Amino acid sequence: MKRILFTISLTVLAGYSLAQEKLSLGQCLQMGIERNLNLKTYEGNVLKGKHDISENRSRLLPQINIGAGLNDNFTPPVSVTDGTAYGKPYNVTKTLQYNSSASLQLQMPLYSQTALTALDISKTLDRLNTLSYEKAKEDLIVQISKMYYLAQNTEEQIGIIKDNIKRLEELRDITQAFHDNDMALSVDVKRVNVNLENLSVQYDNAKAMLTQQYNMLKYVIDYPADQAIAVEKPNVEQVDLAALTGLNENLYELQLLRTQQTLAEKKKKLAKDGYLPTLALTGNWTYTAFTDNIKNWFHSGESNHWYKSNGIGVSLRIPVFDGFEKRSKIRKAQVDIDNAKLSYENALKGMRTQYANAVDDLANNQRNFSRQRDNYLLAEDIYKVTSDRYREGIASMTEVLQDEMSMSDAQNNYLTAHFNYQVSNLTLLKLTGQLDKLIK
């Protein structure tokens, strides 16, 4: 009965696989770069940086404003002037209760080093946003590649388990026939059934694990969750090896740290620029009206008269003392510069160590993969010979099951070695700046 159910499940899965879209690694990477939601936030930050540049550039352009106002001086102010011309020491004049004004105002910086440096800082921040996006894209490529390799590995594992189940089912049928003819013990049949049940559990676990891996892959590349996908069968004989050209010191991670150091230096310059004077051009075009009764503005007469006042000039601002605020900013910026230098030096040394270890890992995993492949093929041959001898009544059931277990271990070791080989090569592709090979 179990065999019938297993056969039915394989048939259903075979029909289900026909509806799957088979995606190559390059297709998954392209989809991820175009659709990944987290990466889109980095794209948004790049766009935001462009707007920041425009915002800072606007501070160097003329600023034109229109203003208007109406005041009710219910206690009118007075002005006091010399009254000797009128035969008294002071002349006191009370202003009218209502006054209104309309003006056009112009202000444009002629020299402002802080505004120029702020614009330069915004360009550096834009560069940081771009580098952060590129680094996030590289991290996404590595993440998708590992998921893809893992799904391939699980698919291979499922295929091997299915083959092992088929072999054990044949062995069970033979053992059952031997038992029916008093040529084998009932315990031998039970032993095969136990191993067969263990393989069925492994198969179910591997299928569940594969489903979860595909779900995660679909999430990362923003593929419709209700549609099925499948990975291509790996070509274990051909791995696109990374060229061992040494650590690429223009990796986006290192460029980010260098740019952060540049940003800290420019922030220090911005604090120093605060000591410099600023010069601005100013101008105004103003009309003002006064009256003792607001209704007079709606009738012609002497009280309904607007007085024009125009002017142009320059304003100079020279910082003298700010309570040592700028000095503290300069010292803080210097600490940021020193920390940025240390971070870059530490990252560079760390990545050089990573590269050296990755080269060793690749060579070691390459050897392990070759050995485990040979060991896996050898274990299959041994199992086949022992199985044939068992059919002939020469070998015992214990020998068959022991060789079957050894073959299963060799198969798992082979799959693990292949996955480790791919991951170590992926690490080197990243450290040498060759990840673009995977997209092609």
Give, region by region, the residue ranges found by the protein language model.
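Periplasmic alpha-helical coiled-coil/stalk elements that build and connect Gram-negative outer-membrane
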Residues: 51, 139-250, 365
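Short terminal targeting/anchoring segments
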Residues: 187, 392-416
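Bacterial Sec-pathway N-terminal export signals of envelope proteins
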Residues: 19-69, 75, 225, 230-267, ...
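Sec-dependent N-terminal signal peptides
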Residues: 4-13
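Acidic, low-complexity, intrinsically disordered peripheral segments
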Residues: 7, 18, 413-440
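Sec/SRP-type N-terminal targeting helices
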Residues: 40-44, 57-58, 110-137, 187, ...
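A short glycine-centered flexible hinge/capping loop motif at secondary-structure junctions
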Residues: 179-183, 390-394, 431
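Small/polar, glycine/serine/threonine/aspartate-rich low-complexity segments that form flexible
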Residues: 67-104, 282-318
